[in-house]
Amino acid sequence: MAKRKFKTEVNQLLNLMINSLYSNKEIFLRELISNASDALDKLNYLALTKDEYKKLTYTPKIEITLDKEAKTLTISDTGIGMDENELENNLGTIARSGTKGFIEQLSGDAKKDSNLIGQFGVGFYSAFMVADKIEVLTKKPLSDEAFSWKSDANDYTIEKAEKADFGTQITLYLKDDEFLDSYRLENIIKKYSNHIPYPIFLQKEKYVASQKEGEEGHYESEISQVNKANALWRLPKSNLKEQDYFDFYKQISHDSSDPLLYIHTKAEGVHEYTTLFFVPSVQPFDLFRVDYQSGVKLYVKRVFITDDAKELLPPYLRFVRGIIDIEDLPLNVSREILQENRIMQTVKAASVKKILGELEKIKNSDKEKYAKFYKLFGKVLKEGLWGFSTEKDEILKLCLFKSSKTGELIDLAEYKKSMAAEQKEIYYISGGKAETLKNSPLLEEFNAKNIEVLICDDEIDTIIMPMIGEFDKTPIKSVMDADFSDDKGEISAQDLEIAEKIKENLKDKVKDVKISKRLKNALGVLVFDKNDPNYAMQAIYKQMGQENLPEVLPILEINKDHEIIKKLIANQSEIAKISNIIFDLAKLSEGQNIDDASEFAKNVSEIIAKAI
């Protein structure tokens, strides 16, 4: 029996579990029960879909027993079990990316960090918070071989063993007596696992009074079910309280915070299905990862099918957690069927409509609550405006933007309501931080005319805002595309000449130099041709790995009425330096880095010295 070493990342994880999360150690039981429930789900599915498993006779259950003398706690299930390879893969190693992500997310807050354990799929190891040693005895159905896995958190062994029935039995050799109290265990089970869909039996001590006068009674052990073991989503809404929903959410999400919102729907008619969705009050750890884990579980007639199907909801709703339970899908549904099945598509469309509708209700009835939601998930929601989403109009109603007038978040309907009668378009500015955008020279004319502009400072706004086109039949335009040509005086030959000379001095830096029709106070501003990507869009392309993009040069617009331009027309002896200063100042006002800071400082110093 050779001892095996844990992989480096597992040792790192175990140290964190034992030393960092100790104050919230009761969650070990939640995790082991959750794993047992998953094992029962898998066997239940096979017993309904695979001929060789249909002949099995067993009772799906989880059993927890105590031995106070030996200081052991044992969790057993009648689920799918594991073979030798699965023991090695499941308990000896962890996917490196998962461990790295887990460690990066640790905050030092024991309560928050303990939630991550289940979310990252490393819950089994939490048992080492309460146990010095763990023994796993397991056997798969249809197999004659059983195996044991033993570990003291330093190394582990796997060897053949004897086990009469299939399933898994986990024995913890406890460090202290806290979790040998059956009443303490019962409270933990009801707190975290009350709605696990399988019965959880707990060994409890029952006091039996003596039948003879003067004699003391004694304690007897009994095993009884302690959880409700019902599919909560199948219960009538009238029978459920808000706390029931909150408790169920915590069970399925491994999140100790109450959700912001729950949506419980039962549909009858051509297709029968039940959905129970939750919007979390904290961001899932993998919200902005490409390989995010789906938060929605699919059931067919209460039979668990999968929790790894991203097809159940569109990516822009990936923050949603919950259950979809459909009556008339085949039990052996495949990923291809999920993508193409008409019933599934109907349920998905109805679910999306319901979720967006409930969010709109919250937006209209509870602004504070909706603002919290939008701060958490607004960026993700806006991804639904990309491409040809059929829900684009509904999503657009839910989007909030900072107002250039108040700095507060407003929606497009509020913007339209405050528009002057002569204003025919909705204006926005994007491509930088909020403060930079708010102070951009591009807004000078809008501020002068008291026209509100939407400050779109999310990175994704640079991509999606040009794609929207209109809201409620009102065009949506970038401030760069606004036309104020009627408000400017005549452009003289001298103006055109100085613009051309500045262009000559900036020939490698700009596409063109033009007399601005939009500036009032600023010296200059950089804009881009309509089909050219601006600085923010170029940065996004690079983040996406498109490093070898052709160079795209901006257009420099100058303010002909600015004192510096007037003096430059009169005295062009320093036009080379001043041209570069104007360009660099325009870049800085857009929040961009200048190419050569030392050269800029030198030019400015020399010009100031001459002016003094």
UniProtKB/Swiss-Prot annotation:
Region C, residue ranges: 540-612
Q: Provide the primary localization.
A: cytoplasm
User: Which compartments does it reside in?
Assistant: Cytoplasm
Record bears the keyword Protease = no
Region feature A, mapped onto this chain: 1-335
Q: Name one GO cellular component term.
A: cytoplasm
Mind telling me which PROSITE patterns this protein's record contains? Answer: HSP90
Cite the entry's keywords alphabetically: ATP-binding, Chaperone, Cytoplasm, Nucleotide-binding, Stress response
UniProt GO MF annotations:
ATP binding; ATP hydrolysis activity; ATP-dependent protein folding chaperone; unfolded protein binding
Origin superkingdom: Bacteria
A Pfam family cross-referenced in the UniProt record is HSP90
- Subunit composition and interactions: Homodimer.
Q: Which family does it belong to?
A: Belongs to the heat shock protein 90 family.
Q: What does this protein do?
A: Molecular chaperone. Has ATPase activity.
Instruction: Write the protein's name.
Output: Chaperone protein HtpG
Q: Which organism is it from?
A: Campylobacter hominis (strain ATCC BAA-381 / DSM 21671 / CCUG 45161 / LMG 19568 / NCTC 13146 / CH001A)
